[in-house]
């Protein structure tokens, strides 16, 4: 067997070994995703990964967020969900509004409007800081949905690879 073939096979083996070590070190949740969700009503806590989420209230029909001089306007209407998030795990975790999904009764999915979220939260760094175990944050998640539409449920995640938890929203 030529030397370059032997070297290529060895390099491939090292890459595979590195991937296996990374999978063990990082954890299997990075490479897998299940579809089973915990489901609760608004106001009840629900866990996904290291986070315990409690959606306390939702207000829709908002057409401006911010101050009179510095504001965001929606394409349709803003729906703002107030939520408490507790890190109930054993390691720090970062909250990201971009992975918190909302659905209307027909199953249409909406993503959070992060720029509007900066205006809605008194501490915009809430999106950038790690939440240590035992600590909590309170956030306002902002969705820009069509006028006349409603949010039926939220799908909440600690990170993009967790299974998610469902919160049914009142109509």
Regions found by a protein language model. Give the residues of each.
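Conserved functional micro-motifs across diverse proteins
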Residues: 1-171
């Amino acid at each position: 067997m030529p030397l370059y073939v032997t070297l290529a096979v060895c390099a491939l083996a090292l890459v595979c070994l590195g991937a296996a070590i990374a999978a063990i070190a990082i954890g299997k949740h990075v490479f897998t995703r299940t579809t089973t969700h915990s489901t609760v009503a608004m106001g009840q806590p629900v866990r996904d990964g290291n986070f315990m989420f409690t959606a306390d209230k939702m207000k829709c029909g908002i057409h401006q967020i911010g101050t009179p001089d510095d504001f965001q306007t929606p394409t349709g209407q803003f729906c703002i969900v107030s939520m408490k998030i507790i890190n109930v795990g054993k390691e720090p975790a970062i909250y990201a509004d971009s992975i918190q999904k909302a659905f209307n009764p027909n199953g249409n999915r909406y993503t959070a409007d992060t720029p509007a979220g900066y205006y809605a939260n008194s501490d915009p760094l809430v999106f950038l800081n790690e939440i240590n175990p035992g600590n909590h944050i309170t956030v306002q998640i902002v969705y820009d949905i069509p006028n006349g539409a409603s949010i039926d449920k939220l799908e909440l995640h600690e990170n993009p690879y967790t299974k998610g938890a469902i919160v049914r929203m009142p109509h």
